[in-house]
Amino acid sequence: MFKHEKRMLQEVKVERPNPQYAAMLQEQLGGPNGELKAGLQYISQSFRIKDPAIKDLFMDIGAEELSHMEMVAQTINLLNGHAVDVGSVDAGEIETHTLGGLAPMLVNASGAPWSANYVNVTGDIAADLLSNIAAEQGAKVVYEYLYRQINDRYVRQTIDFLLNREEAHNALFREALNRVQNKGSNKDFGVTEDSKLYFDLSSPTPPNHFNAPNPTPPGFKNPTQPGQ
């Protein structure tokens, strides 16, 4: 069950309207590394998870991502101002001014519509967790790019909060991956000789080249316990 609380996860505001910044932020609303993609991906993946704690983790983070989506959309709304003006956007998405009446739309920074193809669901807990770790890392990278280019201190505060939450989610998914070392596609990992071969097809071979692997299930040091 979901419910809507009439407050933001964290307050958002802007120094002044800037439709160009709004167009840039559309990437994290309707893009492949955006908040809608993340929320729907984690919630969709949760439906087949049997471990109650991991299922709750996916649902909790998915619900938080939808709260992030609300923050991004409201920031875009404030940056768009009060009058449609295509000329205020030097590059990127202009559908907001030609079609959406300044409403935040489910498109990326170039105006391409959001797609369910962005959502990765395999039904395999290990594969889904690795996909989610990559998704959180990718979202953090996009927020870092936006932070460098948006010169609005309040928008930067919002971006800083969001990218730090991506780091938290990344750490939680890594901890969950450590709990499923013998489940799903992690089971019987690296048990044949074929999995231990390395084909050196590059010539000449550099001095720091890779050698034949010794596959073990993907895992991480426990990110919530730095000493481990």
Language-model features: locations:
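Non-heme di-metal
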Residues: 1-228
